[in-house]
Curated annotation (Swiss-Prot):
CDD domains: NURR_hnRNPQ, RRM1_hnRNPQ, RRM2_hnRNPQ, RRM3_hnRNPQ
PANTHER family (alphabetical): HETEROGENEOUS NUCLEAR RIBONUCLEOPROTEIN
Biased composition annotated in UniProt, kind: Polar residues: 580-595, 611-623
Name of encoding gene: SYNCRIP
Cell compartment(s), UniProt: Cytoplasm; Microsome; Endoplasmic reticulum; Nucleus
Entry protein name: Heterogeneous nuclear ribonucleoprotein Q
Pfam families: hnRNP_Q_AcD, RRM_1
SMART domains (UniProt xref): RRM
Complexes and interactors: Isoform 1 is a component of the APOB mRNA editosome complex and interacts with APOBEC1 and A1CF (APOBEC1 complementation factor). Part of a complex associated with the FOS mCRD domain and consisting of PABPC1, PAIP1, CSDE1/UNR, HNRPD and SYNCRIP. Isoform 3 interacts with HNRPR. Interacts with POLR2A hyperphosphorylated C-terminal domain. Isoform 1, isoform 2 and isoform 3 interact with SMN. Isoform 3 interacts through its C-terminal domain with SYT7, SYT8 and SYT9. The non-phosphorylated and phosphorylated forms are colocalized with PAIP1 in polysomes. Interacts with HABP4.
Extent of the Sequence repeats: 448-450, 451-453, 460-464, 469-472, 478-480, 485-488, 498-500, 526-528, 539-541, 554-556, 557-559
GO molecular function: mRNA 5'-UTR binding; RNA binding
Annotated region (Disordered), positions in chain: 497-623
Organism: Homo sapiens
Length: 623
């Protein structure tokens, strides 16, 4: 054993034999596992110090440690030893996180984070002793509570609407400052502070779940734009945890029961399927559906599995995205709504029929029918309430209609969405790929317009300003889910037929009756008119012309994508939200979907490679 103490300074080596290295009973096990002598000694030193037991580390951690060279493994173990492990529940996972962080720093050429930049452990300990909460630390987040002590709250886990998002948090701020602030709003279920393992500081945002919805709403009122430090204001809003997935490329002949059965075979936690039928054929769906899971975690796992390319449903790898989350409007606002959202209307139903059916309950301000749904504006709320009570579920022209109160728009949300759309338009300077908001299609000319859009009448776009067209939603009613995807099954088909002149820079035609450029023509790129006369471009984006002409050569890529894709050969495309013309909903951020950019104090996005299922995101910005 004498050789184990030689360190190059033999003349200064103490002669006291009591300083001999003491190994634990697991030292030989580490050597047998294949760890180098010095690495095994370093890890065993941690065992002897009582920081970690051998049983705390699983085989995965030992195998990962073996992949490092000796210097790297020793550096990892030293950092692991120096870390405060008192609040780490899964020490094996924590060690793996340290190894991952070390490799990332090694690639970037950065130094190990200064441990002095972390939280004040004395203050954290005092906080935990005062509140009785627990603290679980991983390399990606610090979780305070969840569940809280019985003395604070002994009920069931809080439901949707009890979680808030906190942004613009100073990077060196921790639980000792956040908890005392937010517990004033009400009892906290848990607080999750997202951490950057490369710096040892937080990412600039956190999530706080309260035990009641009232406490969450109170926290937003109290602390949105609150000055938490001199010159530092945090932003607070209600967070919506998403547990729904959008799935495309669904065979149109499949029923809700068949879809539920099939996807339950390949994913876990599926609770419901939201399916919409074609207005003119109730036996066929629209080629997409929404899958609802137990919680966000199971939805994230299902999304990861379905996007792996290894899982096929009906022999096809479908399109999978996060669905837009449902946001519950303020109850006080909903109590003033006088507009009804009516869906499942038969094709024969007109605005005149609707006006006649609903006017018996009170004076109407306006009736607006769009496809197979409509909005009924009452002069007084009492009339709307009576109409919903009497007409909901009743037969109208052969179809049982469904009625709910329409959701008013969130003006701040629309402003944020417009800002994001403007940013996208600057990034992608392609008029037909990202059409401007609220631009009505050209309506001159005769004949059948292109099937590439939604087919809404021109005045519909002014109607959007009055109410968010995608904001109408009541669980599985269309508003929040169906409208944006109304033309999903045929959104890629280019313009056809004779029509009127397309103005320079005008949006491409939408649906029946909206005229495409005059003559047999497609669209030109970047919104400008084509130079040739009478030439029709083929699939992939064509030139815009006047007059009739002969069929031209195959057009280049760009513009609106032409032609349907067959379901069996449907490759994973870019997000459908990023391909649809003139729809502002396309750039709306989705809860729990990674956003681009790494400045979490500004836009709260982070790169996908850093995402874990618990790392929610929110794209709200505060001014």
């Amino acid at each position: 054993m004498a050789t184990e103490h030689v360190n190059g300074n033999g003349t200064e080596e103490p002669m006291d034999t009591t300083s001999a290295v003491i190994h634990s009973e697991n030292f030989q096990t580490l050597l047998d596992a294949g760890l180098p002598q010095k690495v095994a000694e370093k890890l065993d030193e941690i065992y002897v110090a009582g920081l970690v037991a051998h049983s705390d580390l699983d085989e995965r951690a030992i195998e990962a440690l073996k992949e490092f060279n000796e210097d790297g493994a020793l550096a990892v173990l030293q950092q692991f030893k120096d870390s405060d492990l008192s609040h780490v529940q899964n020490k094996s996972a924590f060690l793996c996180g340290v190894m991952k962080t070390y490799r990332q720093r090694e690639k970037q050429g950065t130094k190990v984070a200064d441990s002095s930049k972390g939280p004040d452990e004395a203050k954290i300990k005092a906080l935990l002793e005062r509140t009785g909460y627990t603290l679980d630390v991983t390399t990606g987040q610090r979780k305070y509570g969840g569940p809280p002590p019985d003395s604070v709250y002994s009920g069931q886990q809080p439901s949707v609407g009890t979680e808030i998002f906190v942004g613009k948090i100073p990077r060196d701020l921790f639980e000792d400052e956040l908890v005392p602030l937010f517990e004033k709003a009400g009892p906290i279920w848990d607080l999750r502070l997202m951490m950057d393992p490369l710096t040892g500081l937080n990412r600039g945002y956190a999530f706080v779940t309260f035990c009641t919805k009232e406490a969450a709403q109170e926290a937003v009122k109290l602390y949105n734009n609150h000055e938490i430090r001199s010159g530092k204001h945090i932003g607070v809003c209600i967070s919506v945890a998403n547990n729904r997935l959008f799935v495309g490329s669904i065979p149109k002949s499949k029923t809700k029961e068949q879809i539920l059965e099939e996807f339950s075979k390949v994913t876990e936690g599926l609770t419901d399927v939201i399916l919409y039928h074609q207005p003119d054929d109730k036996k066929k769906n629209r080629g997409f559906c929404f899958l609802e899971y137990e919680d966000h975690k199971t939805a994230a796992q299902a999304r990861r599995r379905l996007m792996s390319g290894k899982v096929k449903v009906w022999g096809n790898v479908g399109t999978v995205e996060w669905a837009d989350p449902i946001e519950d409007p303020d109850p006080e606002v909903m109590a003033k709504v006088k507009v009804l959202f009516v869906r499942n209307l038969a094709n024969t139903v007109t605005e005149e029929i609707l006006e006649k059916a609903f006017s018996q309950f009170g004076k109407l301000e306006r009736v607006k029918k769009l496809k197979d749904y409509a909005f009924i504006h009452f002069d007084e709320r009492d009339g709307a309430v009576k109409a919903m009570e009497e007409m909901n579920g009743k037969d109208l022209e052969g179809e049982n209609i469904e009625i709910v109160f329409a959701k008013p728009p969130d003006q701040k949300r629309k402003e944020r969405k417009a800002q994001r759309q403007a940013a996208k338009n600057q990034m992608y300077d392609d008029y037909y790929y990202y059409g401007p908001p609220h631009m009505p299609p050209p309506t001159r000319g005769r004949g059948r317009g292109g099937r590439g859009g939604y087919g809404y009448p021109p005045d519909y776009y002014g109607y959007e300003d009055y109410y968010d067209y995608y904001g109408y939603d009541y669980h599985n009613y269309r508003g929040g889910y169906e409208d944006p995807y109304y033309g999903y099954e045929d959104f890629q088909v280019g313009a056809r037929g004779r029509g009127g002149r397309g103005a320079r820079g005008a949006a491409p035609s939408r649906g029946r009756g909206a005229a495409p450029p005059r003559g047999r023509a497609g669209y030109s790129q970047r919104g400008g008119p084509g130079s040739a006369r009478g030439v029709r471009g083929a699939r992939g984006g064509a030139q815009q012309q006047r007059g009739r002409g002969v069929r031209g050569a195959r057009g280049g890529r760009g513009g609106n994508v032409g032609g349907k894709r067959k379901a069996d050969g449907y490759n994973q495309p870019d997000s459908k939200r990023r391909q649809t013309n003139n729809q502002n909903w396309g750039s709306q951020p989705i809860a729990q979907q990674p956003l681009q950019g790494g400045d979490h104090s500004g836009n709260y996005g982070y790169k996908s490679e850093n995402q874990e299922f618990y790392q929610d995101t929110f794209g709200q910005q505060w001014k």
